[in-house]
Amino acid sequence: MAAKKDKSVPDSKITDKEGKEKAVKDAMAAITKGFGSGLIMKLGEKSSMNVESIPTGSINLDIALGIGGVPKGRIIEIYGAESSGKTTLALHVIAEAQKQGGTVAFIDAEHALDPVYAKALGVDIDELLISQPDYGEQALEIADTLVRSGAIDLIVIDSVAALVPKAEIDGEMSDQQMGLQARLMSKGLRKLTGNLNKYKTTMIFINQIREKIGVTYGPTTTTTGGKALKFYSSVRMEVKKMGTVKQGDDPIGSEVIVKVTKNKVAPPFKEAAFEILYGKGISKVGEIIDAAVAKDVIVKAGSWFSFRDQSIGQGKEKVRAELEINPELLAQVEKDLKEAIAKGPVDKKKKKSKKEASSDDTDDENLEIDDAIDENND
């Protein structure tokens, strides 16, 4: 007896446009039904999954993530080079989670948390749960116990590289124990993933990068802890320091760019740039200035900045200082910026100056003269 034919499978390649569109929609619907939402989407589509989120403290990064922050009940990886701003970003997420009324735990495997800096970034250190485990298995067991309590909204583990397996700590320095940390992470994440989703607890892993030895083609760096974290993470963010923020000749912060290298809840590969000021964290005012200039809310002419036809300073640092001491002006800029964002993208066509317009008029006159000469010659 012949096998029953699946009517949803075409006999040959579909060539007409309407047929292709319908077939793609049907296939995407089947994938979503069979495997869950978020596994397939059009890269350029603006729609995202209806997922609750925790803001990151950066307006630009919240936009890049597509849902207004990091998703709840998921695993997040923040990775990058040393002193790139990974922990600072995680501390801002902690502060935002606490503002929402959430309970947060910080598992400090590196034993390097600075409570003074955390407080300066807005973290309520009196309410922050902190653990400094002795080895990797202990750290993940503590995390799992906290998740299963059903009372924790966010757990941050700093860092994956410091989650050293007990066997490695108890062993000799000369012992060759390959893949212990990778196996530890794989086993721990398998156990954690289901509970995180069940209790809507977000877990952020801070990770470091390492150079690949003997690589000629492809990426020259990788993250620690094996491949399990890459697989189980719903969102992965790479943090890079791009430059230094200066006030005169004095460095006062870092220019940072974050690339969303993986995103299961919205289209990935978006980037966000912002400034991290020493001792203060992410500069919200700096982000507002950049966004306002991009939307023509604040007009930049050379080094001068103006708002509503009134000069507000020369140089970005002076504008930042002016907005910080003048909350009413900052509120007006924010209001106009929100209205500009709601209107959609700014027309990128360059506005012609009087000189350019005059030049265009001259060119038109020359063309008319040339046309007249050609007609006479004919």
From Swiss-Prot:
Q: Which SMART domains match?
A: AAA
Compositional bias ranges of the Acidic residues kind: 359-378
Gene3D superfamilies in the cross-refs: P-loop containing nucleotide triphosphate hydrolases (3.40.50.300)
Protein's UniProt keywords contain DNA damage: yes
Give yes or no: UniProt keyword DNA damage: yes
Per the UniProt entry, the signal peptide is none
**Keyword entries, A-Z:** ATP-binding, Cytoplasm, DNA damage, DNA recombination, DNA repair, DNA-binding, Nucleotide-binding, SOS response
Annotated residues for binding of ATP: 80-87
Can you name one GO molecular function term for this protein? damaged DNA binding
BP-aspect Gene Ontology terms: DNA recombination; DNA repair; SOS response
Please state where this protein is localized: Cytoplasm
Region spans: Disordered: 1-20, 344-378
Give the CDD domains listed for this entry.
RecA
Q: Which InterPro entries match?
A: AAA+_ATPase, DNA_recomb/repair_RecA, DNA_recomb/repair_RecA_CS, P-loop_NTPase, RecA-like_C, RecA-like_N, RecA_ATP-bd, RecA_C_sf
Mention any one GO cellular component term assigned to this protein in its UniProt record.
cytoplasm
Q: Which family does it belong to?
A: Belongs to the RecA family.
Q: Which HAMAP family does the UniProt record give? A: RecA (MF_00268)
Protein name (database record): Protein RecA
